[in-house]
Amino acid sequence: MKPAALAVLVAVVLAGCGSSSPPQITIGAARTYQLGGWVLPSATAGKPTTLSFRIDQPSGAALTNYRTGAGPHTGVHLIIVRSDLGAIIHKHPKASADGEFHQALTFPTPGRYRVVVDAYPNLSGPLRNFQLFRVITVPGAAPHQPLPPFKPTVTVSGYRFTIGGRPHLRAVQSNFLTLHVTRPSGQPATFTPWFGALAHAIFFRAGSLDYFHTHVCSARTTGCTSVLGATRIMGTQTRPGALRLGVLLPVGGTWRLFVQCKADGHVLTAPFTLDVR
């Protein structure tokens, strides 16, 4: 595949774990980063493979300096979603000294997958983070599962994820969802940090696959606030087993929310369908 270029917005338009949608406000200057060294030897459903890539700066040199720290806004988030929003892969590969990433992957099924490389460079200036995109097609008969309507409760490996009330969400506005997670025994789940956060709220829009990503972090953890334009948002843990998820989406439509957390040592992914006006 040829390297895909991305206009990275520098005028404080999309920051934090930003969106891939067309910006809603006027922007100023742009800088161009692109994916380079993209190698995927094979892509067969159910069989391990390794994806290699790097991020090239506008100068052509590989980006080697990424943010570090205890929070989630560090390094690179590699997020891969199937086009029907029926499967997601979320990894945090580590950069080598020369800026190369090598990540083992297994695609669960055939299909078309959108790859999001959400990068946090350790650079001076207003650029907080940016996203680069690719598409991978895994050969075979691809499943197509119509998105189910909103259901307040999803059960994953015996754990119950329940959203309180019926969400009333509006684009480009701060919204919050209350989420309760209980063990199979019915007791509140205990969360431990995974990839720097107690919970990741990953959003993809049906059809266009626009992307946004917010977090819930432990108290006093830095690098947890997501930004869209001038709006900032961060989730919180309100009590054991209870999360207040931040929702900040750039456009209306049907969105799929993937809540990912590590509860009692188990990494869980709970999907919800949301309507945004």
Where are these regions (language model features)?
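Bacterial N-terminal signal peptides that target proteins for export
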Residues: 1-7
